[in-house]
Regions:
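Conserved C-terminal helix/tail region of periplasmic/extracytoplasmic solute-binding proteins
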Residues: 291-315
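Pocket-lining segment of extracytoplasmic ligand-binding domains
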Residues: 88, 162-255
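Short, glycine-/small- and polar/acidic-enriched structural segments
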Residues: 25-153, 162-164, 180-184, 206-208
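Secondary-structure end/capping motifs
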Residues: 222-298
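Small-molecule pocket liners
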Residues: 39-40, 109-115, 198-199, 210-214, ...
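Short helix-loop capping/hinge motifs at secondary-structure junctions, enriched
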Residues: 119-128, 155-157, 219-228
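Bacterial N-terminal signal peptides
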Residues: 9-19
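Bacterial N-terminal signal peptides that target proteins for export
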Residues: 1-9
Length: 315
């Protein structure tokens, strides 16, 4: 009789773990944050994830945000479960003690962000930016590009006059000549090149990788790992479709953002979509970003990027 008790206990424990896992794999609702121009917007408008989850009894609630930092604040306070942002916002969120997890990343896309100047500007290179007014979104991916581009040109961040503006305000300032240069990402980059004859003096190639990260709140990623993995898988399938059907993807994103389809066609030609799980190399590159922001004083503390590793990726 004594020998049966441990066996029964083990069976009960196994059943409990399996039951908990099954429950965790099927949340009633998944709340996803998105921006009009990012891959989750494409996923929303395509409807493929909604269809997949509906078959499993899972509802999706889509919540729009104006930018990555606000989205990650929503992730931190529990108003959303999943988000996709560029590489800088998660580092700033981690510095603010946000309890997030890196689920995966896109391919590097350095051609989708650049430093531009007016067509007739005397500025010919990054070195010419010394003492100039440079518009950018503070704490964004392009903030990292500017720091690294200046250092590559033998300058430092204090050698320019940063003018911190969101894209819409920076676009107006660029048009009026209130800033000498603008550091910006697609599709805004493609738009200003097409409609304002902006001239590129440096993109991110050879300087910074520029990833999109797929992020989750820690409670969601650890509590519903199968669902989180399924989202990454769906993003990978969507990426394959978008890369092979750029005209259709451009039409969807044009509708989402209000930008001309031609702007999105230009953007998608230099934007490789994709979704893969995190690797040591990508964590190293993200750590380099965080360390750079700390070094130049944009982050108040040192960030341990790997503290946001998903338990499924720990070895």
């Amino acid at each position: 009789m004594q020998t049966k008790i441990p066996v029964l206990s083990a069976l009960a424990l196994s059943f409990g773990l399996l039951s908990a896992h099954a429950f965790a794999a099927n949340p009633e609702t998944v709340t996803i944050g998105y921006q009009k121009a990012n891959i989750f917007a494409l996923l929303k408008y395509r409807g493929t994830l909604d269809e997949t989850f509906k078959k499993e009894g899972i509802n999706i609630r889509w919540v729009e945000f104006p930018a990555g930092p606000q989205m990650l604040e929503g992730l931190n306070v529990g108003s959303i479960d999943l988000a996709a942002t560029g590489d800088a916002p998660p580092a700033f969120a981690q510095a603010a003690k946000a309890d997030l997890i890196y689920l995966g990343h896109s391919p590097a896309n350095p051609k989708t962000e650049a430093i531009v100047v007016p067509k007739d500007s005397p500025i010919k290179s990054v070195a010419d930016l010394k003492g100039k007014r440079v518009g950018l979104n503070k704490g964004s991916d392009v903030n990292y590009l500017l720091v690294k581009a200046l250092e590559d040109a033998g300058l430092n961040y204090k050698d320019v006059k940063p003018v911190y503006l969101p894209p819409a305000d920076a676009r107006a300032a660029f048009q009026k000549g209130a800033i000498d240069a603008w550091v910006i990402w697609d599709p805004f980059l493609a738009e200003v090149e097409a409609n304002a004859d902006a001239r590129e003096i440096r993109n991110a190639e050879g300087l910074v990788p520029h990833y999109t990260f797929y992020l989750a709140s820690r409670p969601f990623a650890e509590g519903h790992p199968d669902t989180a993995k399924q989202v990454v898988d769906e993003l990978s399938k969507l990426s394959d479709w978008a890369n092979a059907n750029q005209d259709e993807a451009a039409a969807i994103l044009s509708k989402s953002t209000g930008l001309d389809k031609s702007i999105w066609q230009t953007t998608l030609k230099r934007l490789p979509y994709g979704a893969t799980r995190m690797t040591p190399q990508v964590f190293d590159e993200q750590q380099a970003l965080a360390d750079t922001f700390t070094r130049v004083g944009l982050l108040p503390v040192k960030v341990d990027v790997r503290s946001a590793t998903w338990s499924l990726d720990k070895k």
